Amino acid sequence: MPRPIVAKVDSAVLASNLSIVRRHAPQAQVWSVVKANGYGHGLNTVWQGLQQTDGFALLDLHEAVVLREKGWRGPILLLEGFFQPADLAVIDRYRLTTVVHSDWQIEALRRMTPRAPLDIYLKLNSGMNRLGFSERALPGAWQSLNALKHVATLTLMSHFAYADMPEGVEGQMAVVARAGEGLTGPRCLANSAATLWHPATHGQWVRPGIILYGASPSGNWQDIAASGLRPVMTLQSELIAVQSVPAGGRIGYGGRHRVSETHRVGVVACGYADGYPRHAPTGTPILVDGVRTSTLGAVSMDMLMVDLQLCPKARIGSAVELWGDHVKIDEVAASAGTLGYELMSALAPRVTVQIR
């Protein structure tokens, strides 16, 4: 028998989450962001649930080719652009849309002769200070690209650093307004947080990522609890052993947790080598036999321990939900001092993914 841990991905929930995104941005088209192997859900899995999207956005040229070969004929956006001039031949062949964020990329485009004009997303650094042209340099970059006969639609793009925080988007939107003054063309600005909470940013295209998979861009599930968004992935396993630990007994590596009275402790077939956060402390929420309880002690490579005091019927073989509908991935991430983004994308290849 295989190890009982499995990640179940519900493509119907993915489609429902996309519909909710559309209700938040009814006038915009949607780039469904499927980078990092579909946020850990599996590109081959998630694209089936996102067939009604307007386009897919990702990083890897190979994954873009995979989508084309699977039959996707709509737009595909390369979020980091191309990494060397030779990539342009693949972009041309598979009719991909590329981000441009550096002068050398403009020069490479100038030198190429594509079979048909390409759609380009010109990236503005409006305050993230990661990729993109400065406010001062952007108009010149726009003019250079706009002068090329083999550039079709030129879209202004930027990325918000604080859309999920009190600072919001106002400062960066002011930069976008100044840099884009007089530049006619579509705008693509809104990430997940801006799609939900800043409608003035929506423009012609929005780029939802984490919310498609049913987690919060802020890391706080309560921020999206009323939205109708649901987790797409359920990571589940089983109890593979039950221990009766006497009063004073210590749990796991380093004995980080000591029980004050005789305690039933369950052992779950899941550890940090499966993608569960190693730094999740005692008290991290978990569901055992339909009852919400918590972890005990340090997470091991292949196993973790759970408190069964509230689960009197739990036994070997009882179902365990690590995260999903009942224990949100944001809750587990917050307990471990990280974000749902990291946990999703860190799901280990050894975990079987099932589509339902």
Curated annotation (Swiss-Prot):
Q: Which pathway is recorded for this entry?
A: Amino-acid biosynthesis; D-alanine biosynthesis; D-alanine from L-alanine: step 1/1
Residues given in the record as substrate binding sites: R130, M301
**Database matches in InterPro entries:** Ala_racemase, Ala_racemase/Decarboxylase_C, Ala_racemase_C, Ala_racemase_N, Ala_racemase_pyridoxalP-BS, PLP-binding_barrel
Cross-referenced Gene3D superfamilies, in alphabetical order? Alanine racemase, Lyase, Ornithine Decarboxylase, Chain A, domain 1
Its needed co-factors are: pyridoxal 5'-phosphate
CDD domains linked? PLPDE_III_AR_proteobact (cd06827)
Q: Which GO terms describe its biological process?
A: D-alanine biosynthetic process
Q: Quick one: a GO cellular component term?
A: cytosol
Q: Which reaction does it catalyse?
A: L-alanine = D-alanine
Which purpose does this protein serve, as stated in its record? Catalyzes the interconversion of L-alanine and D-alanine. May also act on other amino acids.
Q: Which family does it belong to?
A: Belongs to the alanine racemase family.
Protein name in UniProt: Alanine racemase
**Species for this entry:** Sodalis glossinidius (strain morsitans)
Which lineage do the record's taxonomy fields give for this organism?
Bacteria, Pseudomonadati, Pseudomonadota, Gammaproteobacteria, Enterobacterales
